[in-house]
């Protein structure tokens, strides 16, 4: 909902409890809608909207070698929710694909905070994800319990208690637990996101993307 602004015409990233995001994808506000990808040697290339929509983990699994040619995607469009904010969607820690995990590890600490989203209906915490986050993450951790409108509050309380105990027992510090759903006010998720201060000292990944976005904005402003 942050990305779509509750507008059904906005292209969305694939969403599932399974690993669906194929390649780290940066989403940011811009003067116009644009899709690009950046190669491992930092060469920027334009991408059509139709191609962007077709890229999924399933597709890349079928076309071997393509994912190694793309460092990350950048999607920009007009969105007041993204003023001063960029969201990085990653393949995730809970993927069974070792390459997905490596991609996530490579970029995760370039962000100011990690928002770990749990489906309230899943009911479990992935142990391998906990191990990787504990070992690799050195940024603030927030837990988002999503789809809370699909269960009674008493059940949501139990899920949060289970997640909290599991992470605490594993030695993971959680800055805040956030409950969210399709019916909740967008501010319920935007407020904690915007409260996160910049913590990165060497934001090379972020700086590269911001430079790309500034160049794109100037290009459109001059035309």
PLM-predicted stretches and their roles:
Residues 1-215:
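Globular "head" domains of long coiled-coil molecular machines
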